């Protein structure tokens, strides 16, 4: 930016001091707005891993108990229901972080720019898939909460039979397969972005290694998730 000091001084002496201050305020406001945007994105990234991502892993592990039969799953589900301060944990550790991550994620999905037309490498396509999987995950999680947590508040019992009844429909079985895989992909691919944005993987080599690690996480969790789904069928 090139500034002519004589013109600035002339501008201020000629009565432009107030306007100059207003311009400075607006520029400062823009910087502050940028700082807020940076903070919101960092918070979105952090909450996607801690606690939302950790809850996803825990939820998949609990569901995987269904592979050992109805009794094993019901026992694991009952254990989770008996946790101390359960409702406070659900509100502050799960639902509020999840709502923020989802709402701000939708904002990012509809405002971020695609680079796939200019750059054809894998990472840009994964960036696009991250946004698509986020929307699918939001739809799936919202429906899953309605079918389980909301129904539980209305008097239904969350147990093996509930999930078996839901997944007895071929449509719902397909919906859950797509939803679970989208959710796991969104988490695993999000880990890659998290590591980059938080300065954990800076070099190209570390980012390549991170790609393989997150791919392994996606495969491992997908195996757990799909086994759990078919255990109810």
Residue ranges of predicted features:
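Membrane-embedded alpha-helical bundles that constitute the cytochrome b-like, heme-associated redox core
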Residues: 3-5, 20-233
């Amino acid at each position: 930016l090139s500034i002519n000091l004589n013109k600035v001084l002339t501008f201020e002496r000629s009565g432009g001091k107030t306007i100059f201050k207003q311009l400075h305020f607006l520029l400062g406001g823009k910087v502050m707005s940028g700082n807020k945007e940076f903070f919101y994105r960092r918070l979105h990234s952090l909450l996607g891993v801690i606690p939302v991502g950790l809850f996803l892993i825990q939820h998949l592990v609990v569901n995987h108990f269904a592979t050992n039969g109805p009794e094993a799953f019901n026992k694991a589900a009952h254990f989770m229901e008996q946790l101390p301060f359960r409702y406070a944990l659900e509100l502050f550790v799960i639902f509020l972080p999840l709502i923020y991550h989802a709402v701000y994620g939708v904002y990012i999905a509809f405002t971020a720019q695609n680079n796939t037309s200019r750059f054809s490498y894998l990472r840009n396509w994964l960036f696009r898939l991250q946004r698509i999987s986020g929307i699918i995950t939001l739809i799936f999680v919202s429906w899953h909460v309605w079918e389980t947590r909301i129904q539980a508040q209305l008097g239904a019992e969350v147990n093996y039979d509930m999930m078996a009844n839901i997944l007895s429909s071929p449509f719902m079985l397909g919906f859950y397969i797509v939803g679970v895989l989208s959710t796991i992909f969104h988490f695993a691919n999000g880990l890659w972005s998290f590591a980059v944005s938080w300065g954990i993987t800076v070099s190209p080599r570390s980012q390549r290694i991170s790609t393989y690690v997150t791919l392994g996480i996606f495969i491992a969790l997908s195996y757990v998730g799909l086994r759990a789904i078919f255990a109810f069928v």
